[in-house]
Curated annotation (Swiss-Prot):
Protein name: UPF0335 protein A1E_00570
Example GO molecular function: DNA binding
Domain of life per record: Bacteria
InterPro entries: GapR-like, GapR-like_DNA-bd
Transmembrane segments: none
Family named by the database record: Belongs to the UPF0335 family.
Length: 78
Protein backbone atom coordinates (compact mmCIF):
# COMPACT_ATOMS: atom_id res chain seq x y z
CA UNK A 1 0.00 0.00 0.00
CA UNK A 2 1.42 3.35 -0.93
CA UNK A 3 1.91 6.16 1.54
CA UNK A 4 -0.64 8.28 -0.32
CA UNK A 5 -3.34 5.61 0.03
CA UNK A 6 -2.53 5.10 3.71
CA UNK A 7 -2.67 8.85 4.33
CA UNK A 8 -6.03 9.14 2.55
CA UNK A 9 -7.49 6.22 4.51
CA UNK A 10 -6.27 7.64 7.79
CA UNK A 11 -7.72 11.05 6.95
CA UNK A 12 -11.06 9.42 6.08
CA UNK A 13 -11.16 7.52 9.37
CA UNK A 14 -10.29 10.64 11.34
CA UNK A 15 -12.88 12.68 9.46
CA UNK A 16 -15.60 10.09 10.10
CA UNK A 17 -14.75 9.90 13.79
CA UNK A 18 -14.76 13.69 14.12
CA UNK A 19 -18.16 13.88 12.41
CA UNK A 20 -19.59 11.18 14.66
CA UNK A 21 -18.15 12.83 17.77
CA UNK A 22 -19.90 16.07 16.79
CA UNK A 23 -23.16 14.22 16.16
CA UNK A 24 -22.80 12.55 19.56
CA UNK A 25 -22.25 15.92 21.25
CA UNK A 26 -25.31 17.34 19.47
CA UNK A 27 -27.43 14.37 20.56
CA UNK A 28 -26.26 14.64 24.16
CA UNK A 29 -27.19 18.33 24.16
CA UNK A 30 -30.61 17.48 22.73
CA UNK A 31 -31.16 14.82 25.41
CA UNK A 32 -30.12 17.31 28.10
CA UNK A 33 -32.68 19.78 26.74
CA UNK A 34 -35.40 17.13 26.79
CA UNK A 35 -34.66 16.33 30.43
CA UNK A 36 -34.76 20.05 31.27
CA UNK A 37 -38.11 20.40 29.50
CA UNK A 38 -39.51 17.36 31.30
CA UNK A 39 -38.27 18.74 34.62
CA UNK A 40 -39.91 22.10 33.94
CA UNK A 41 -43.19 20.23 33.43
CA UNK A 42 -42.89 18.55 36.81
CA UNK A 43 -41.38 15.21 35.84
CA UNK A 44 -38.70 13.64 38.04
CA UNK A 45 -35.59 13.41 35.86
CA UNK A 46 -33.86 10.95 38.20
CA UNK A 47 -36.85 8.59 37.96
CA UNK A 48 -36.93 8.99 34.17
CA UNK A 49 -33.24 8.06 33.95
CA UNK A 50 -33.90 5.00 36.13
CA UNK A 51 -36.75 3.95 33.85
CA UNK A 52 -34.49 4.31 30.80
CA UNK A 53 -31.89 2.04 32.43
CA UNK A 54 -34.55 -0.53 33.34
CA UNK A 55 -35.95 -0.54 29.80
CA UNK A 56 -32.53 -1.61 28.52
CA UNK A 57 -32.62 -4.80 30.62
CA UNK A 58 -34.16 -7.94 29.21
CA UNK A 59 -37.32 -9.19 30.91
CA UNK A 60 -35.57 -11.94 32.91
CA UNK A 61 -32.86 -9.62 34.24
CA UNK A 62 -35.49 -7.03 35.15
CA UNK A 63 -37.58 -9.62 37.01
CA UNK A 64 -34.47 -10.87 38.81
CA UNK A 65 -33.49 -7.34 39.81
CA UNK A 66 -37.04 -6.54 40.98
CA UNK A 67 -37.17 -9.73 43.07
CA UNK A 68 -33.82 -8.97 44.69
CA UNK A 69 -34.83 -5.39 45.44
CA UNK A 70 -38.10 -6.57 46.98
CA UNK A 71 -36.25 -9.15 49.10
CA UNK A 72 -33.80 -6.52 50.37
CA UNK A 73 -36.58 -4.02 51.08
CA UNK A 74 -38.57 -6.65 52.98
CA UNK A 75 -35.48 -7.68 54.92
CA UNK A 76 -34.80 -4.08 55.91
CA UNK A 77 -38.46 -3.27 56.52
CA UNK A 78 -38.71 -0.53 53.90
Amino acid sequence: MSEVVVKEQLEQYISKIERLEQEKADLLEEIKNIFQDASSHGFDVKAMKSILKLKKLDKDKLAEQDAMLELYRDTLGI
